[in-house]
UniProtKB/Swiss-Prot annotation:
UniProt-recorded Gene Ontology molecular function terms: lyase activity; nickel cation binding
Classification of source organism: Bacteria, Bacillati, Cyanobacteriota, Cyanophyceae, Gomontiellales
Organism: Cyanothece sp. (strain PCC 7425 / ATCC 29141)
Keyword Translocase: no
Pfam family, one: Ni_insertion
Entry keyword annotation includes Nucleotide-binding: no
Protein name: Putative nickel insertion protein
Keywords assigned: Nickel
Family: Belongs to the LarC family.
Amino acid sequence: MTRIAYLDCPTGISGDMCLGALLDGGVPLDYLQHHLQGLGIAEEFSLSWHKVEHQGQQASKAEVQLRAHGHHHHPPARHWPDIVALIQQAGLPLRAEAWSLAIFRELALAEAAVHGVAAEQVHFHEVGATDALVDIVGTCLGLDWLGIEELYCSALPTGGGTVKAAHGRLPVPVPAVLQLWQKFHVPVYSNGIERELVTPTGAAIAVTLASQFGPPPPLQLEKIGLGAGTQELPLANILRLWIGQKATQAAVPQGQDGSDRVEEIILLETQIDDLNPQAIGYTMEALFAAGAVDVFTQAIGMKKSRPGVLLSVVCTAETVESCETVLFRETTTLGIRRSQQQRRILARQIQTLDTRYGPIRLKIAYQQGKIVNVQPEFEDCAQVAKQQDLPWQQIHQLALSTWYQHQPSP
């Protein structure tokens, strides 16, 4: 059976909460310490854990104690290439290495988008420090030790307020977290707590490794790991890691196995013939930021023989108002057609594949438990193609062929 895990995050997610949940779930501390030494930064930290209590519930608190560094006593800040080099020379298990590199890549891309620089030029501050390296690599080591093949995650709370960062005070969620949520279309909500609940490290772990966000998948629960956060909150500040076996087809009622599902959507449409084409691209980005599931355009002919654009927006009942607001604000339209439809969705998961040029994520679609489509992620292929100065198509084909080579013969 497939071993899976579910990140239940009622008060958010951070790297140390993930580590605590894994240690609480049975991952040996000495195993993590042994492999983390390979990073070559053992003199910078010590790792330990202990039991704490939040709202009457016991959980495990992972502690990454930083050691003094020179006169200023600050852990070193690092660039993305520095982190890649540390991870690649550490001799980690293959999955742990690939996952760690993928998580830091998403962090670099998010920070690059926020600051308007190339990913290689991103100067990590909080997320590039020693404790984040330990949190991310340690989390990947723990998931690999547990034999987790699929990871799922709950919707994430937004938090609120402000937080002190290297560039001054930032609103919560911080820009890098928002960038990750937007890129991966993460479902979020407010639980009324005005604190930083999701850190950049925690967000990157979730979006990179989780194949789906939402309610827990069908599983036979074997163990729960409870990872404590640092803050005292109105709710028990605990991340709950559900560990178990994926439920078999026979164990799940028909239509609830996640192989495919039907959900209600809303289609918004408007025809435009008097808008600067440059504004269309901006509007599409704004619609995705407002929660649109998909946005697309079609060239059409309109009255008086004018060429125009049919702008279509797929959204949910929860985001329809915000999407309509964007359309009225950013375009010249005077009206929007709204229709309720259904869509059928195949189950899918993201797998990170270790190729000779680096890790590449693939999206795998299932129908009735069988694989029906495999596609490498475009952005991963593009990033590797640029780094290696190779054609995108060559990297795309390499990822597919490498994946198929690792599959068992029928």
